[in-house]
């Protein structure tokens, strides 16, 4: 998993409440057995006019919706998503943070997130940041007012730095912060204990050798 320490990026405003995971990545794109390739279909039903979108159709063959925020030139290359309350509600599909990450987003700022989406984001290197609703609304005003609006997210110091230098503090669980700073997903954390796991398996097979044998068919 990619480390997250400090990130400066262009902000895109998703000015909708209750954005659910089916809007983030529609169900027909979940058939893949791979963990990659979801970025082109992020927000598919809003992002393209030719609906319903289908797996396997190249992005170049689609008809973009010019009114959708991510298709507007001023937000091209955005890596920080500014959202409204209850972002990521709906089903528990882990494909939602995968799609956001593979599109290029590193952080999402909102007044609140659905619990499962919130947890899945941390496990996939995407930083969800909860701020007071009034602060989020102020950021929306600034993004709309200033083209090319950027923020710097400093995870180590737990602050968001505005362009003019003003800082907005945010809270993050200490263990989740540790994992993001070091790029540890669940597998990475487990592999840090590889020596202990091997020692346990060796001791187990030495004292209970019958466990090494398979049952007859």
UniProtKB/Swiss-Prot annotation:
GO biological process: L-leucine biosynthetic process
Reaction catalysed by this enzyme: (2R,3S)-3-isopropylmalate = (2S)-2-isopropylmalate
GO cellular component: 3-isopropylmalate dehydratase complex
Enzyme class: lyase
Any one GO MF annotation of this record: 3-isopropylmalate dehydratase activity
Amino-acid biosynthesis as UniProt keyword: yes
EC number in record: 4.2.1.33
Pathways involved: Amino-acid biosynthesis; L-leucine biosynthesis; L-leucine from 3-methyl-2-oxobutanoate: step 2/4
Sorted UniProt keywords: Amino-acid biosynthesis, Branched-chain amino acid biosynthesis, Leucine biosynthesis, Lyase
InterPro entries: 3-IsopropMal_deHydase_ssu, Aconitase/3IPM_dehydase_swvl, AconitaseA/IPMdHydase_ssu_swvl, IPMI_Swivel, LeuD
Subunit and partners: Heterodimer of LeuC and LeuD.
The family this protein is said to belong to: Belongs to the LeuD family. LeuD type 1 subfamily.
PANTHER family associated with the record: 3-ISOPROPYLMALATE DEHYDRATASE SMALL SUBUNIT, 3-ISOPROPYLMALATE DEHYDRATASE SMALL SUBUNIT 2-RELATED-RELATED
Physiological role: Catalyzes the isomerization between 2-isopropylmalate and 3-isopropylmalate, via the formation of 2-isopropylmaleate.
Protein name (record): 3-isopropylmalate dehydratase small subunit
Organism the protein comes from: Paracidovorax citrulli (strain AAC00-1) (Acidovorax citrulli)
């Amino acid at each position: 998993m990619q480390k997250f320490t400090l990130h400066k990026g262009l902000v895109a405003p998703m000015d909708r409440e209750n954005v659910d995971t089916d809007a983030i990545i529609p169900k027909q794109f979940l058939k893949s057995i791979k963990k990659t390739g979801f970025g082109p279909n992020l927000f598919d039903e809003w992002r393209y006019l030719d609906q319903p979108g289908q797996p396997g159709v190249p992005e170049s063959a689609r008809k973009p919706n010019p009114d959708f925020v991510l298709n507007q030139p001023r937000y091209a290359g955005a890596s920080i998503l500014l959202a409204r309350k209850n972002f990521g509600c709906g089903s528990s599909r882990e494909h939602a943070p995968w799609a956001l990450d593979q599109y290029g987003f590193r952080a999402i700022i909102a007044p609140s997130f659905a619990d499962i989406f919130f947890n899945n984001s941390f496990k996939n290197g995407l930083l969800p940041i909860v701020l007071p609703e009034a602060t989020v609304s102020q950021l929306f005003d600034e993004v709309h007012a200033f083209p090319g609006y950027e923020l710097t997210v400093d995870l180590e110091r737990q602050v968001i730095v505005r362009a003019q230098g003003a800082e907005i503090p945010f809270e993050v669980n200490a263990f989740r912060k540790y994992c993001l700073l070091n790029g540890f997903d669940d597998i990475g954390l487990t592999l840090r204990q590889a020596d202990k796991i091997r020692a346990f398996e060796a001791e187990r097979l030495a004292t209970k050798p019958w466990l090494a044998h398979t049952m007859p068919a």
